[in-house]
Amino acid sequence: MAIDQNTLKQAVYPIVGACHEVHKHLGAFLNEYMYQDALAIELSRRNIPYEKEFAFSADYKGQRIEHQHKADFCVHGADTDILIECKAADKLIDTHRQQLWNYMRLSGIHVGVLYNFAPMYAQCEKYYYDPVTVRMIAF
């Protein structure tokens, strides 16, 4: 499946900007929940529509699984919804990426931002989930 990376970059640009603003004002080494609360404030200030603790389920052989996953945020864009996973870790690791991959795969939302607020220099990774290849593609 061909994806337009410029369209994806434009879609996540305001989200990444809000994350950078939170990191700029709060700095490094805080807990994840403080960054999440601040990001909710920043998204609201920027009039970016979102749901915090976005809950979704999965299907198993046509039946809904009772347990729900919760992504930190789902931003509702004009063209696409975008998941945001916030971290406050020394560095982003494969487990964080796998979590986002699963969330995108199960929720049907194919664009995601993984943002690590804790380091002195924040880490931001942006991904597209391709349901045909079942892979995440960085952009």
PLM features per residue range, with description:
Residues 63-101:
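Mid-chain, well-packed structural core segment of small domains
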Residues 1-26:
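Interdomain/boundary linker segments immediately adjacent to catalytic/signaling cores
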Residues 1-6, 133-139:
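Intrinsically disordered, low-complexity and often Lys/Arg-enriched segments
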Residues 25-79, 120-123, 127-133, 139:
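Active-site metal-binding core of divalent-cation-utilizing nuclease and nuclease-like domains
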Residues 86-135:
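Nucleic-acid nuclease catalytic cores
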